[in-house]
């Protein structure tokens, strides 16, 4: 095992390895920031309006899709922090492709989770913005503009996190291809 690790680190120049590790660290920090920004925007998203004496309120907790997105972002942010620690502790010392395979699986799982949250929130957001005339569901964003804008911004941060996780998944997969069996 030590021979494989030595050969792998000799095949790759140190500068390239440092750039790769730096990019991984940067992208993971961006994922953490975007995930927690999305979570904060969604968890604090509420609006109350008065229409003809009727007080109506909109809150993220009324929608299971928005709650799922928030919880998915919390999990993604927390596990991205764990993977950042793993990368800092292990990545600097060793360029063993097995470690990058572990990161690949980790990033793929997180990407799948945030993709599910984004898809669910996008569907309910579209329904709120445009309604559905076939089922009789009316649009609400013309009345709850602030609520819809914050929800849209939250989902946009989640999609940004998704793109960063996709890049991390691709780079980790590329790096793990060097595993010798």
From Swiss-Prot:
Glycosylation sites: 59
Subcellular location: Cell membrane
Membrane topology: Multi-pass membrane protein
Spans traversing the lipid bilayer: 19-39, 71-91, 101-121, 151-171
Extracellular side: 40-70, 122-150
Keywords linked to the UniProt accession: Cell membrane, Glycoprotein, Membrane, Transmembrane, Transmembrane helix
Cytoplasmic topological domain residue ranges: 1-18, 92-100, 172-181
Keyword Flavoprotein part of the UniProt annotation: no
Superkingdom of origin organism: Eukaryota
GO terms under cellular component: plasma membrane
InterPro entries: CASP/CASPL, CASP_dom, CASPL
NCBIfam families: A_tha_TIGR01569
Subunit and partners: Homodimer and heterodimers.
Family: Belongs to the Casparian strip membrane proteins (CASP) family.
Protein name as annotated: CASP-like protein 1F2
Organism lineage string: Eukaryota, Viridiplantae, Streptophyta, Embryophyta, Tracheophyta
């Amino acid at each position: 095992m030590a021979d494989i690790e030595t050969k792998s680190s000799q095949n790759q120049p140190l500068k390239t390895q440092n750039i790769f590790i730096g990019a991984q660290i940067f992208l993971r920090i961006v994922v953490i920031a975007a995930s927690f920004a999305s979570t904060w925007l969604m968890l604090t998203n509420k609006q109350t309006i008065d229409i003809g004496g009727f007080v109506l309120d909109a809150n993220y907790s009324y929608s299971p899709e928005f709650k799922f997105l928030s919880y998915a972002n919390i999990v993604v942010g927390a596990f991205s922090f764990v993977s950042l620690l793993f990368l800092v502790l292990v990545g600097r010392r060793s360029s063993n492709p097995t470690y990058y395979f572990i990161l690949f699986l980790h990033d793929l799982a997180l990407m799948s989770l945030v993709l599910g949250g984004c898809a669910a929130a996008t569907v309910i957001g579209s329904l709120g913005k445009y309604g559905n005339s076939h089922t009789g569901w009316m649009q609400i964003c013309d009345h709850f503009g602030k609520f819809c804008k914050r929800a849209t911004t939250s989902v946009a941060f989640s999609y940004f996190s998704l793109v960063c996780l996709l890049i991390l998944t691709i780079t980790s997969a590329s790096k793990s291809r060097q595993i010798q069996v």
